[in-house]
Amino acid sequence: MLFPKRLIVWGVLLILSLSQFVLYLPATTCTNSKGLRLCAPQFTITVIGGSSTANEFIASVREFLRLISYLTIDMGWSNEFTDPSVYEDENLVDTFQPDKVFELNYFGFCKRSNKSKVYCTSNENYGMDVLEVLVRDVGIQLGNISTTRSNETKKFGDSLVLTYRLALTSIRDFLKHDKHTGNALSKALIGSPDPNVKGASPTKNYLKGVNLAFILMMFNGMVFYFAVLEIIVGFLSICVVSAFGGALSVGKRHRLFPILLKSSSSILVVIATLTILCNIVYLIALKTLEPEEVTDVGSDNAAVHTTGWELLKVNVGSGFIMGLARYAIQWVLLVLAFLAANHYKAKPKKSDKYTEDTSNSPSPDLMEK
C-alpha cells in the first residue's frame, strides 16, 4: 500500500513540474517568420504620439525615415527598383505609423499590421527593449528596400541596433557633460527655450528621454538573463523531481533527494518572482510612456504628462498571462515539494540517537570527581 501512495505523490509533483515547464514555451515564441508564425507576447505596443515633445519627435523621425528610404532606393543594389510606385508611402519605412503593432517577447518580436503578421525575428540578447525593437524594424525594412538578398535584412537590423546603442551612450554622456557648461552646445543644436513658454526646456526634455532610453536598455538586458536562468532552473526542477520519484521507488526514506527537491523548488520560485516583478516594473515604465486619455474634450484641463515622452499605446499580451499562470503552478509545486520532502526524509536512527546521548552525558569518572 505504501508504494502506490508514494507513486501518486511523485506523479502529482511530476505533472506540476512538467506543466510549469511547458508554460515556458510561449516565452520562446515570436522569433521565426518561417512556417507558422507563433507569438504569445508579453506586451504589445503601438507608436501613437501624445505630448508635444513626443509628437514633434515622431514627426521628425517619420520625415527622416522617408528621406532615408528614398536614398536607400536610389542607391539600391538591385535593378528591380525602376517602377515609380516603389516611392509611394506604403513601400517606405513605416515603423512609426499608428497602424503597426509590435508584439514583444523575451527572445524576439513580431510586427503586425491589420491583424496579419508581417514578420517575426529574434532580438538577440536585448530582450524586450521597445526602442531597440523599433530601431531593428527600421534596419530590417531598409534591408528589404536596398537588396533582394534575404539574408542581408538581419544584418541591417543588427548593425542599426549596435549603432543605436553606441549613439545612445554617446548622446547621454554629451548631454550630462554639457550641463556643466550651461548647456551651450545643446542650445546651439536644439535651440534656446522660449521664456514665454512654461514647462521644462527642450534640453531637459531630451536629456530625460535619453536617460529613460538608457535605463530601458540596461533593464531589459537584465530581464533577458533572468528569463534564461528561470528556464534553466525550471528544467533542472523536472530532473530533480524525476530523480526523487526514482528514489521513492527504491525506498521510502531518503536524505539527499528531499534536500534537492526543496532547494530546486525554492530557487525556481525566487527567480520566477524576480522575473515577474521585473515584468511588472517594465509594464509600469511603459505605461508612463502612454498618453492619458482626456475624458472631456472641451475642458480647459489638459492631460498631465508624466515624462514628456508619451508616445506609446501598451497592452498586456497572452504570454504575460501565461507567465502568471506558470508562477501560480510553481508556488503550488513549492508547497507540495516541501510537504513531500519532509514526509519522506530519513529520520535519525536509534543508534545515532544513542551515540548522541552518550556523547552528551558526563562520564562516570567526572561524576566521581
Curated annotation (Swiss-Prot):
Top-level taxonomic group: Eukaryota
Keyword Metal-binding: no
Keyword field: Endoplasmic reticulum, Membrane, Sporulation, Transmembrane, Transmembrane helix
GO biological process, one term: sporulation resulting in formation of a cellular spore
Keyword Endoplasmic reticulum: yes
Major subcellular site: membrane
Stretches of the chain found on the membrane's Lumenal side: 28-220, 287-319
Topology term for the membrane: Multi-pass membrane protein
Localization of this protein: Prospore membrane; Endoplasmic reticulum
Cytoplasmic side: 1-6, 242-265, 341-369
Region (Disordered) location: 348-369
GO cellular component, one term: endoplasmic reticulum
Transmembrane regions listed in the UniProt entry: 7-27, 221-241, 266-286, 320-340
Family of this protein: Belongs to the SMA2 family.
Function in brief: Involved in spore and ascus formation. Required for the efficient assembly of the precursors of the prospore membrane to a continuous prospore membrane.
Name of the protein in question: Spore membrane assembly protein 2
Gene for this chain: SMA2
